[in-house]
A protein has these predicted regions:
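Non-ligating segments of multi-cofactor redox enzymes
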Residues: 1-257, 263-309
Length: 309
């Protein structure tokens, strides 16, 4: 593996926190709106951002892809959103769950909570829960908004309305603090969603990215493309010493030497920084991420000599 390629991977993983902060800021450019108690409603809201970021956030500069998809599917005029689906597929092919690890504001929020000094618990024994997010994607994002409709043929955005904690964190709380009318209108649904947010906050302090692992439908969608994404993990078998440090460092419970592009891998780069021989790195292009050592080839003359003996 070239030193230049390995060095770039180390640099990217080292500055991941700054990249996450920058992505969160770009996703929420209109910060003065927090004081005004209103929403940005310009042309940017016609474009989806890659991560989970609520449309109702006063500072949001774009639309949440999950919320936008449900709005179209639940509409009485349309039955499917080709634009948003195509947008998500494109991001999935280009980046996969790199978006989760580097560009998602709510993922970064959970990581910051996890830095609070307290006893941490592993999620390795809770791996079956990782399949819940696929059920959330299928049922709450696709099926219910499309088929559970009212008298005029409109469906609710079930994930956003009943489950997503980001909507409360970025939308309901700041808007209600700045707007007395919204504050007076808060009811039982807000109480339910606020309880979910509190649960995610507490779990995030103890577990690493619990919402990302277990419930996020956007992460589930990107995970479907992790194995074919152009942005992948690369393991150089010729320099790997099988020390296991990469697997111990991974907080997403992935052994990169066995499955470099596992569906749960968010390309955070912890394994890259933990590897003592720089055998693990990021790569961009096609392939399975495994670089097998090249077997030495015997000279032709030597082979002919051995055959005649």
């Amino acid at each position: 593996m070239g030193k230049k390629f390995s060095g770039a991977s180390q640099l990217l993983s080292r500055f991941r926190g700054w990249i996450q902060a920058g992505a969160a800021l770009l996703t929420n450019l209109h910060l003065p709106n927090f004081l005004k108690g209103g929403l940005y409603q310009g042309a940017g809201k016609n474009v989806c951002v890659p991560g989970l970021n609520c449309y109702s956030c006063p500072a949001a500069s774009g639309a949440c892809p999950i919320g936008a998809f449900q709005a179209v599917v639940g509409s009485s005029k349309f039955s499917f959103s080709y634009y948003i689906t195509g947008f998500l597929i494109l991001l999935g092919v280009l980046l996969g769950r790199f978006i989760c690890g580097f560009l998602c504001p709510f993922g970064w929020f959970q990581e910051l909570l996890h830095k609070i000094p307290t006893k941490k618990l592993s999620t390795k024994r809770l791996k079956p829960l990782t399949y819940l997010k696929y059920a959330v994607l299928l049922v709450m994002v696709f099926l219910l908004p499309a088929f559970l409709v009212n008298d005029v043929g409109m469906g609710d955005p079930f994930f956003c309305k009943y489950l997503c904690p980001q909507g409360v964190l970025e939308g309901a709380i700041p808007l209600s603090l700045a707007n007395s009318g919204i504050r007076a209108a808060l009811g039982s649904l807000f109480t339910w969603k606020f309880s979910i947010l509190l649960a995610v906050i507490v779990l995030s302090i103890v577990f690493y990215r619990p919402f990302c692992k277990w419930l996020c439908p956007l992460g589930a969608f990107y995970a479907l493309f992790n194995r074919v994404s152009l942005f992948q993990m690369k393991v150089d078998r010729s320099t790997c010493v099988s020390c296991g440090k990469c697997a111990k460092a991974c907080k997403m419970d992935v052994d990169v030497t066995k499955t470099p592009n596992h569906t749960e891998c968010i390309r955070c780069g912890m394994c890259v920084r933990a590897c003592p021989t720089s055998a693990v790195s990021f790569r961009y292009g096609f392939g399975d991420g495994k670089k097998e050592p090249v077997e030495p080839v015997e000279p032709v003359d030597k082979l002919k000599t051995e055959e005649t003996k």
